[in-house]
From Swiss-Prot:
A motif (Nuclear localization signal) lies at residues 34-38. The dsRNA-binding region is required for suppression of RNA silencing. This is Non-structural protein 1. Residues 218-225 are annotated as: PABPN1-binding. A motif (Nuclear export signal) lies at residues 132-141. Residues 175-210 are annotated as: CPSF4-binding. The keyword Disulfide bond does not apply. Belongs to the influenza A viruses NS1 family. It comes from the Viruses. Residues 1-73 are annotated as: RNA-binding and homodimerization.
C-alpha cells in the first residue's frame, strides 16, 4: 500500500475529527454539517478499502498535523486567493438558448440541461470557474457548444442549494457527456477544464471517464431526466 495513501487517510481522519468537535459546539452552518456527513461516509468507505481503523488513523493524523504546524510560520498559513478562469466570453455566458427536446436533471446542487434533439455533432464543453490549489473550486457555469456555436447543453449551480465539490462537477459532466454521446455526438472538454478538474485527458480532449460510467450516465439521462 502506498505510504502517501495511508498518510492522506490519516490526516483526513484527524481533520474530520476537528470539524466534528467544531460542529458539536453548534458552530457549523448547514453546508458545513452537510459536508461533514458526506465526508464521514467517505472516510468509512476508504477505511474499509484500506483495511485501516479510523480511530487509530485519527491519532496518527494528529501527529502528522502537529509536526507540520510546528514547522509552519504564520505567513505560510495564509489561504491563497482563488483564481477565476474563463473559457467563455461574456456573450457566450449570457446568451439565451432554446431546446427542441429539453431534458433536465438535478444532481446534488447542480442542474444539468441538454437538448436531446442534437445528433451527430462535434461538441465542446466550456466552463467558467474558480481554482484554488490548482484544482477546480467552484463552477460558475458550463455550457456545451457545437462547432457552429449553438448552445446544446448546460450545467449550472442551483442558487437554493449552495456548495459543491470538484467531484460533484465531474459527475455532472459525466452525465452531460453520456447524454450527448447517446445521440452519436462527439464530445470533448476544453483544455482549461481538463487541466483543473482532471489534471489529465485523452488526446481527443475527453476526460478520463471509464466506459461503464459513460453507459450508466447515458441511461440516466434517457430514463430519469
Amino acid at each position: 500500500m502506498d505510504s502517501n495513501t495511508v498518510s492522506s487517510f490519516q490526516v483526513d481522519c484527524f481533520l474530520w475529527h476537528v470539524r466534528k468537535r467544531f460542529a458539536d459546539q453548534e458552530l457549523g452552518d448547514a453546508p458545513f454539517l452537510d459536508r461533514l456527513r458526506r465526508d464521514q461516509k467517505s472516510l468509512r468507505g476508504r477505511g474499509n478499502t484500506l483495511g485501516l481503523d479510523i480511530e487509530t488513523a485519527t491519532c496518527a493524523g494528529k501527529q502528522i498535523v502537529e509536526r507540520i504546524l510546528e514547522e509552519e510560520s504564520d505567513e505560510a498559513l495564509k489561504m491563497p486567493a482563488p483564481r477565476y478562469l474563463t473559457d467563455m466570453t461574456l456573450e457566450e455566458m449570457s446568451r439565451d438558448w432554446f431546446m427542441l427536446m429539453p431534458k433536465q436533471k438535478v444532481a446534488g446542487s447542480l442542474c444539468i440541461k441538454m437538448d436531446q434533439a442534437i445528433m451527430d455533432k462535434n461538441i465542446i464543453l466550456k466552463a467558467n470557474f474558480s481554482v484554488i490549489f490548482d484544482r477546480l473550486e467552484t463552477l460558475i457555469l458550463l455550457r456545451a457548444f457545437t462547432e457552429e456555436g449553438a448552445i446544446v447543453g448546460e450545467i449550472s449551480p442551483l442558487p437554493s442549494l449552495p456548495g459543491h465539490t470538484d467531484e460533484d462537477v465531474k459527475n455532472a459532466i459525466g452525465v452531460l457527456i453520456g447524454g450527448l454521446e447517446w445521440n452519436d455526438n462527439t464530445v470533448r472538454v476544453s483544455e482549461t477544464l481538463q487541466r483543473f478538474a482532471w489534471r489529465s485527458s485523452d488526446e481527443d480532449g475527453r476526460p478520463p471517464l471509464p466506459p461503464n460510467q459513460k453507459r450508466k450516465m447515458a441511461r440516466t439521462i434517457e430514463s430519469e431526466v
